[in-house]
A protein has these predicted regions:
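Conserved active-site and cofactor/substrate-binding residues in soluble primary-metabolism enzymes
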Residues: 14, 18-21, 33-36, 40-44, ...
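Short loop-to-beta-strand entry elements in the cores of soluble alpha/beta enzymes
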Residues: 27, 137-152, 215-229, 245-283, ...
Length: 419
């Protein structure tokens, strides 16, 4: 993203410098705020985001044509109310911890100006969340929305900014790039006064953030492996997977991507999927689906499939399915470029693999994990504590979800406390 990208014009640089200067001033003023000041503003912006959860979700659907309205409302609620309940009593100003036995105190200091990339899949909830966290930590943010979701993201920024100002936040604490380009992003990532890059998006965005030479937080693609082990409650697992994988049409990067199923319960599991509205692809259908949905050169899902309904994806691929089909399930026999559906699929398409043993199942889950989801999310359904521990030891993921839906479990606040 920053490599081989031309510099902005002089006029554009003046605009970008103005945004940075404004944010830098706001961040400097913010350092003088007390915990009481911060918490007052946080509560106000949380309530504003919550009040606008539905209209922002509707605006996102209208602009991007991605996802499910009701689920985007829930995302906005999680990003505001759920997050607030988790952080409301946390100290973020001045001395926050003391270690008298070591003669140490921990003092919270803001980092300054944050440059933040916003994805098309979660264009409003991500803004709401980042605004709340910025206020709580006394930082200023320059937002760079996805070009195809600029209107809804910019509206979310406007709502949070105006509310924050009304309740005493410094002027310029939030801003949003207008009609921006890759050149703008590259310029701001390299800017000496930008202290942190917060990139939520695709591989390119995250790679650019980490290649900038600055501190960066990258939230990129997940390729969530799921192990459905023979001792699991199959009915519960299938319901959880369908709920999770169809939530917002599969746009959460923690959603299930490949389910590795023990041989002993494979047939019963697929039967339950069909009972609950899934379509099991034949070998030929799976091949067509993979060829249609995944770009062979990049190994990424084609944009036309992101966040679309299963029946619409089936239509594009030329598959005949029932009109009430919720999920497309494609059997695969390996992981890697020769098995295109083993990659991340931000849509209601799920790969399944039949494993002859626990060792094989765990190996395939590791392969899926390494095929594009390192450090992200993994799920295991089992009553066997030894299997659960082995899974956790082998898989490189920041979140190991046990006997719960991947996407909703990773959001936190519902099935666990991982907010």
């Amino acid at each position: 993203m920053t490599k081989n990208v031309a510099s902005p014009t002089e006029e554009r640089m003046a605009y970008l410098e103005g945004l940075v200067r404004q944010a830098k001033t706001a961040a400097a003023v913010f350092t003088q705020y007390t915990q009481e000041d911060v918490d007052r503003i946080v509560k106000a912006v949380v309530l504003a985001g919550l009040d606008h959860a539905q209209p922002l979700a509707r605006l996102a659907i209208e602009e991007t044509r991605i996802g499910v309205l009701e689920d985007k409302v829930i995302k906005n609620m999680v990003a505001t109310e759920f997050v607030y309940n988790y952080i409301r009593d946390k100290a973020t100003v001045g001395t926050i911890r003391e270690f008298p036995e070591r003669g140490l105190v921990e003092v919270a200091e803001p980092i300054g100006v944050i440059f933040s990339l916003i994805p098309i899949t979660n264009p409003t909830s991500t803004v709401l969340f980042k605004c709340i966290m910025a206020i709580k930590t006394r930082n200023a943010v320059i937002f760079s929305p996805h070009p195809s979701a600029w209107r809804c993201s910019a509206e979310a920024v406007r709502i949070m900014y105006e509310t924050a100002l009304k309740h005493g936040a410094p002027e310029g604490v939030f801003s949003c790039l207008e009609a921006h380009t890759l050149e703008d992003n590259a310029y701001l990532m390299r800017h000496k006064d930008v202290a942190l890059i917060d990139a939520t998006g695709g591989r390119g965005a995250v790679k650019a953030a980490y290649s900038s030479g600055k501190p960066a937080l990258g939230v990129g693609p997940g390729n969530t492996p799921v192990y459905l082990e023979k001792t699991a409650d199959v009915s519960m697992a299938v319901v959880d997977i369908i709920v999770s994988k169809t939530f917002d049409n599969g746009t959460i990067c923690a959603s299930e991507q490949t389910v590795v199923i023990d041989d002993e319960i494979y047939d019963a599991t697929l039967k339950k999927f069909v009972e609950l509205g899934a379509h099991i692809c034949s070998e030929k259908e799976a091949e067509v689906l993979g060829r249609t949905l995944v770009d062979r050169q990049t190994g990424c899902l084609q944009p036309i499939a992101v966040g679309q309904k299963a029946i619409n994806i089936a239509r594009v691929a030329g598959l005949t399915v029932k009109p009430d089909t919720k999920l497309l399930i494609a059997p695969i026999h390996g992981v890697g470029p020769e098995h295109p559906l083993s990659v991340e699929k931000l849509c209601p398409v799920l790969a399944v693999y039949r494993a002859k043993s626990a060792d094989e199942a765990l190996r395939v889950c590791v392969d899926v994990n390494h095929a594009g989801g390192l450090g992200h999310t993994a799920v295991v359904f089992s009553r066997n504590q030894e299997i659960i521990r082995r899974f956790g030891d082998l898989i490189n993921a920041g979140r190991i979800i046990v006997n719960a839906p991947g996407s909703i479990g990773a959001l936190g606040g519902v099935y666990n406390d991982m907010v």
